[in-house]
Amino acid sequence: MLLLVGLGNPTPDSENNRHNIGFKIIDAINKKFGLSKQKPKFKGLLTTGNVGDQKVYAIKPLTFMNNSGICIRELIEYFKIDAENVIVFHDDLDVEFGKIKAKFGGSDAGHNGIASIDKFIGKEYSRVRIGIGKPKDKMEVSDFVLQNFDEDEMLGLEKITNNITDSISILIDKKLDLFSSTVNNKLWVLNVELLVCLMWVNLHSSTLSQTQAKPKLQIFLFVQ
């Protein structure tokens, strides 16, 4: 029996925040594997079902990020789930957007949700760190993680969640390194300014406002 946890904040305006990527992963798992309808239990939204041959519970804590551990401890004590059978999905500033890193144990690396879980159940559980990149310029980290993904990132995010759910059986078998490499090899993200865009701008410069910026195209190359 496994517990899958997605970290985030429960308010409607937080839905597309970078900090809420864990919630999106749980939603994708629920949909792909037809888990039960979400029910408010253990201070979270709980679903259950099977992923392959494995019985799983999946939860999105409603305690807000900094108190995530309260929800997790109540649930694992009730269902008698060992901490080593807990897998947590969360955002990570130190991982490039479009990449993931799965590991067992370790430090919280300044992530308040992970720090809360460590406090209530210890460090002996698996984490899937999902890259959101770093803030640009002088934006505060707290502002960056509570900011919505931009349009280009939302396009990539859908593919990331699909890649994770497609490879979830590897994760459930606790082959963390293989899971990371499998997911990461499916997605290349490339930022380019295409010559054709510049040519288009030059050809249509008479119809463009002088103050209008030249378009910059972000391409997501998906490798299956």
Predicted feature residues:
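A hydrophobic, small-residue-rich beta->alpha segment in the mid-to-C-terminal subdomain
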Residues: 151-152
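Short glycine-enriched, charge-decorated loop/helix-capping segments at active-site entrances
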Residues: 101-107, 145-148
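Hydrophobic alpha-helical segments within soluble ligand-binding/sensing domains
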Residues: 110-113
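Short, highly charged C-terminal tails/helix-capping segments
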Residues: 180-187
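Conserved G1/Walker A P-loop phosphate-binding module
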Residues: 188-224
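Nucleotide and nucleotide-moiety/phosphate-recognizing core
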Residues: 2-105, 115-126, 136-140, 155-161, ...
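Internal, active-site/partner-interface "lid" segment
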Residues: 130-132, 137-146
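Solvent-exposed beta-strand sheet faces enriched in polar/charged residues
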Residues: 89, 129-131, 218
